[in-house]
Amino acid sequence: MKISQLLLLFCFFISLHTAFAQDESSYTFKKPSANGTGKVYLGREIAHVMSFEGVDWLERNSRTQEENTILAVTSLPIKSNSVVADIGAGSGFYTFRVAQRIPKGKVYAVEIQNDAIAYLKKKALEDKLANVEVIKGTEISPNLPPNSIDLAFMVDVYHELAHPVAYLASLSKALKPGGRLLLLEYKEEDPAVAIKAEHKMSVKQAKKELAANGFKLVENGTFLPLQHYLLFEKTVN
C-alpha cells in the first residue's frame, strides 16, 4: 500500500475516533427504565431498539388505518426521480410503498439487523422493485454516499438511535444541499396514543435535538392520527 493511501486511512480512523468521542461526550447515564437504555440525550432517555422479531406488528393489517399510512406516504416531499433513504426500514412497510411513488428514483433501505436485511432483499426481489437498494448501516452511520439523497425519513426510529449525534452528522453528509429529514414519531403529548413512553417523542424535544445537530424544523404536520410529521432541513451544507 502506498504511503499516501496509508495516510488517508490513518486520517479516516482519526476522524472517526474524534467523531465518536464527541458523540459519547454528549450523553449522561442513569438507571435504565423498563424500555430504555439508561443513556440520556438532552433530557430524553434513548429507547431500546425494537427487535425484528416484531415484524408481524410492523406488517399488521390494521396499521394502514390506525396510522393512516397512505396519507403519510402521499405527503412525502418527493418527485418521481427523487433519491430517498428509509432509515431503520424494518420490514420495508414504507420502503416498498415509497418505491412505487418514485419509479425513476431510488430508495435506500437502511438497516442494522441482519434478519431485516435478508427480509428486505427477498421482498425487493419478489416485488421486482429494481429501485430499492438495501444498505447495512451501523449504530453511528447509515453508510450512504456523500451528497447522495434528497430525503431521509425515519418512521418511529429516531428515538431508538443509540448515537444520535454521530448518526445525524453522518446522515447530514449523505443529504444533498437543501436535503431534508422527516421524522414520524408517536405523539408524546397525547396520552391516548397507547405506545410505551420511551417510544414516543414531543415536538419540543425533537426540535431541540435536531437543532443541536444542524437541522431546522420547516413543517410540523398535524394530520396523522398517532404520529407527528416533522420535516427538517439541514442548515449546514
Q: What are these regions, as identified by a protein language model?
A:
Residues 23-77, 83:
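Class I SAM-dependent transferase core
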Residues 80-90:
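Conserved class I S-adenosyl-L-methionine
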Residues 91-103:
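Conserved SAM-binding loop of SAM-dependent methyltransferases across substrates and taxa
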Residues 113-115:
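Conserved SAM/SAH-binding beta-strand->alpha-helix loop
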Residues 127-139:
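Conserved SAM-binding strand-loop segment of SAM-dependent methyltransferases
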Residues 142-151:
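A short acidic, Gly/Pro-enriched loop at the edge of an enzyme's catalytic core
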Residues 150-164:
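A short SAM/SAH-binding and catalytic strip from SAM-dependent methyltransferases
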Residues 165-180:
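A short glycine-rich, Lys/Arg-flanked "PGG" loop and its adjoining helix->strand segment in the class I
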